[in-house]
Amino acid sequence: SRETYHRISELPKGARVGIVGAGLSGIELASELRESRSDLEILLYDRGPRILRNFPEKLSKYISNWFSKHNVTVVPNSVIDKVEPGKIYNNGKPENIDLVVWTAGIQPVEIVRNLPIDMSTTGRVIINQYHQVPTYRNVYVVGDCANLPHAPSAQLAELQGEQIAEVLKKQWNNEPLPDKMPEIKVQGFLGSLGDKQGFAYIMDRTVTG
């Protein structure tokens, strides 16, 4: 956002910037910030043991090597408990930070989080393989509100919608539902590392350069 840009531009030389969340947004922000402000200390907090842990290790290594070469510190296995002015708590331990940028993802709206149904630890609705709420089979949950193994995205919601359409079609025709729904496969994504490098994961293939 514009406010974040202004706050970063006003930071003095040697300031510490903590980026919480090492998904695509965090990765791209860290790389762009490094190229625009070489005088800052940048820390990228990742909840997992490696960047983009749900994708091939080749992709993780490529990104990690770029960060290592450009002096961006990746902090794995991070759990940010609390953020205070000038301080961040990672796994209960305080660290001095001049600016925190939160890219750790989104959560469902409050009305969804307060529904009297089973939720994941991230506040998303637990659904069955047909994308239904188990206790309310006439209710389907799609997109950011659904608890799925993939990161929320428009692409994922569209794939869910296609499966739900098939489920509804069978129900309207009084046909039995399949014992096992096909696994949802996200087609891929693109990411950048600064102005001149990038990466892609398309149809189970990793492309870097």
Predicted regions, residues:
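Short glycine-/acidic-enriched loop or helix-start segments at secondary-structure transitions
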Residues: 29-30, 54, 111-113, 151-152, ...
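FAD-site-proximal beta/loop scaffold in flavoenzymes
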Residues: 1-13, 87, 94-162, 166
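Cofactor-binding loop segments of dinucleotide-utilizing enzymes, especially the Rossmann-like FAD-
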Residues: 22, 47, 144, 195
